[in-house]
Amino acid sequence: MVAVGKTSAIAAGVCGALLLGYCIYFDRKRRSDPNFKNRLREKRRKQKIAKERAGQSRLPDLKDAEAVQKFFLEEIQLGEELLAQGDFEKGVDHLTNAIAICGQPQQLLQVLQQTLPPPVFQMLLTKLPTISQRIGNAQNLSEDDVE
């Protein structure tokens, strides 16, 4: 019975030593790589860009009425779902996208003012100018492509 405990202790010690050796070997290999820092910076930059893009919905072709309508309905639905789950930031972002693309934003704002709690509606009003500007910039870029 003592032999089993001693054997398992030796096995655990050997496994620990192998793990430590493995870590030291790959750490040394990583540090000696001349491109490591460049690859790490590039990876972090890509992650940052991906994170920024995840927060922004992909805008539809503003000349395609069907795509705009589909985008509008998806944004309203996503916004409502996220607000129901308690994620007010993302929910308001999606509702703001829908308002910015909407053909009659004043009527939609009136409906939202009646249905949303006042703090959430205020959050929506503060985000609306930045989202509208982004969509306006996207529209200007698409017009520049045509010229």
UniProtKB/Swiss-Prot annotation:
Record flagged with keyword Disulfide bond: no
Topological domain ranges for the Cytoplasmic compartment: 27-147
Keywords in alphabetical order: Membrane, Mitochondrion, Mitochondrion outer membrane, Phosphoprotein, Protein transport, Transmembrane, Transmembrane helix, Transport
Transmembrane segments: 4-26
CC per GO annotation: mitochondrial outer membrane translocase complex
Keyword Transport attached: yes
Cellular location(s): Mitochondrion outer membrane
GO terms of molecular function: mitochondrion targeting sequence binding; protein transmembrane transporter activity
Subunit and interaction comment: Forms part of the preprotein translocase complex of the outer mitochondrial membrane (TOM complex). Interacts with tom22.
Protein name stated in the entry: Mitochondrial import receptor subunit TOM20 homolog
Taxonomic placement: Eukaryota, Metazoa, Chordata, Craniata, Vertebrata
